[in-house]
Amino acid sequence: MFSLKPPKPTFRSYLLPPPQTDDKINSEPKIKKLEPVLLPGEIVVNEVNFVRKCIATDTSQYDLWGKLICSNFKISFITDDPMPLQKFHYRNLLLGEHDVPLTCIEQIVTVNDHKRKQKVLGPNQKLKFNPTELIIYCKDFRIVRFRFDESGPESAKKVCLAIAHYSQPTDLQLLFAFEYVGKKYHNSANKINGIPSGDGGGGGGGGNGAGGGSSQKTPLFETYSDWDREIKRTGASGWRVCSINEGYMISTCLPEYIVVPSSLADQDLKIFSHSFVGRRMPLWCWSHSNGSALVRMALIKDVLQQRKIDQRICNAITKSHPQRSDVYKSDLDKTLPNIQEVQAAFVKLKQLCVNEPFEETEEKWLSSLENTRWLEYVRAFLKHSAELVYMLESKHLSVVLQEEEGRDLSCCVASLVQVMLDPYFRTITGFQSLIQKEWVMAGYQFLDRCNHLKRSEKESPLFLLFLDATWQLLEQYPAAFEFSETYLAVLYDSTRISLFGTFLFNSPHQRVKQSTEFAISKNIQLGDEKGLKFPSVWDWSLQFTAKDRTLFHNPFYIGKSTPCIQNGSVKSFKRTKKSYSSTLRGMPSALKNGIISDQELLPRRNSLILKPKPDPAQQTDSQNSDTEQYFREWFSKPANLHGVILPRVSGTHIKLWKLCYFRWVPEAQISLGGSITAFHKLSLLADEVDVLSRMLRQQRSGPLEACYGELGQSRMYFNASGPHHTDTSGTPEFLSSSFPFSPVGNLCRRSILGTPLSKFLSGAKIWLSTETLANED
């Protein structure tokens, strides 16, 4: 219904194989025995030898020869040839350099050059011609191309059909995670790649934090105690943990334990639950220190009982507030774009970044980006979340997020509000616990929204939009976040790996039900366990080495306990507004709800400045005036890193997340450029500060603590004594704007040097028109 089919690939000359030159004559396919590295439960279903992976479109001299393999987990290209032009590779322990998980594949296109035929392959389809070329379009914007010039035609056809079949399963239990976990239970083996696997539940298992050696586990909110600790952490004295949904007896799309107002009895909740869509009772999210609470709730479908139940719920929330403040209700369905609109915007964004040749889009790049509406929607979610922060923080009102089912838009808004209000959720462990609480356990439909089973009518990238909005905050307040944008990008990539239970199911109940059925069919004894225990995405040691995980750390971050010394005295850290700003121009004089007013919008037609939507009907002029005053006062003061942060949401401040959307486009790389250069220098400084701090602690401490300090591992990837940095005055040659990802080996297009897009990637102001860019020196 609301999804758009992936855009059909454009087969222009830049996609066709180049004229054969002496390069091909001189490059003989290597005849060697190449074997894949398989995970437990992974099996090879088809393979073909003498395959050529295309590295560039204008020459074949960089192409690699090897074997193309399709397993029940990934497609893998195995070669002995070194990757040309590549200076650095960020290795995932689960995937090889040329591997693509099956759940990351969006579209498979086969081509026959001689017959000038092409076909988009679906599951269980027949292929009437022998393919000479295979093009794989990935969900993360990668395009990978293989040639079968020297391969057996039947073998090439079979491997193409196998990839199409296994990348588009129709049943949840056909996803690789089930085979992996089943093998683990049968073999009683708790290791993967030699690293112990997580023992957590289907929500993903607690896992350690991103840093090497971190012992802080991510709470999964699968138990009573996790919710109770969160109540105590936030000081929500008027709320209690309720267990009426144990065994999912009330709702199959809520967690077994929920937090409700203390004044509501279990019996009342059971009666009320029948009136809500999906029986999704009000679900507590978070409480402010002033007593105001953030609550999410589905619509009341019983029209006759709607007023009565709504009044009872609001009264209970009011009683839970120490000041008995009123409740502010936000109807997200009326305020924000729906999931269909978000999906349509993402499809347009992907088509702009991937499918169209740059020569055809260069003159209309800025207006085309604006027309996707992706940045507009990111801005809309940030703006509305900031307005709710005002209600909670300044007005001391409890906020109820109301949505038809309460498991899509409310996930994103509730998470953004908490990131803005609570510095704990800006740490790595806190951010992971937030995703567990507001997405995984609250019933966000990862299976459908990520389209793991190729049901495109239910697909919508709301989780990516949340990560994008979080990146906007990180970009504006870099010192307020413990994690880096690399962490956010890798987190998004992990949703496309069908090994982790975290991003595999529509609800905790579905995980328990499906895994129990699978265990019975495979004669697996579960004992007292509630379903199979899937690997945890939060156990990052499954995917990356301790050294690589240090790239998750943000060198800008100033922890709450970190002091700074001024004039010989220790003071808490506070940044001025000027030093905080990473924006392209100052804040305009007329600020309205965090955006510039109509009279200050630039009139340029191709501008990316996004015009404000009309304010919600429920807001009065007085509320608008109060909100405007709150934002104006907040932005006039120095920002407190350990308090509230608010986004600047004018068009000049909402940017395209280049690392996420352009990292696989070779032409978009800026060698020795991009934000990574600043990241590199600041990492060196942060590492030096850490070393000096350890030395000071060793001087002041006893032998035991001094010994511990000496063993402390650097939290920075780049450090003065590390293997990746020998000259502190220079920049490593492998750095580029795509770091730590390498786009080499993905489908290349013609050069874009000198075009508006290349200037945009180099940091040109996005509100300038094509004509202005053309006139720049």
Curated annotation (Swiss-Prot):
Gene3D superfamilies: Pleckstrin-homology domain (PH domain)/Phosphotyrosine-binding domain (PTB). InterPro entries: MTMR10_PH-GRAM, MTMR10_PTP, MTMR12-like_C, Myotubularin, Myotubularin-like_Pase_dom, PH-like_dom_sf, Prot-tyrosine_phosphatase-like. GO terms for molecular function: phosphatidylinositol-3-phosphate phosphatase activity. Keywords: Phosphoprotein. The keyword Cell membrane does not apply. GO terms for cellular component: cytoplasm; cytosol; membrane. GO terms for biological process: phosphatidylinositol dephosphorylation. This is Myotubularin-related protein 10. The gene is MTMR10.
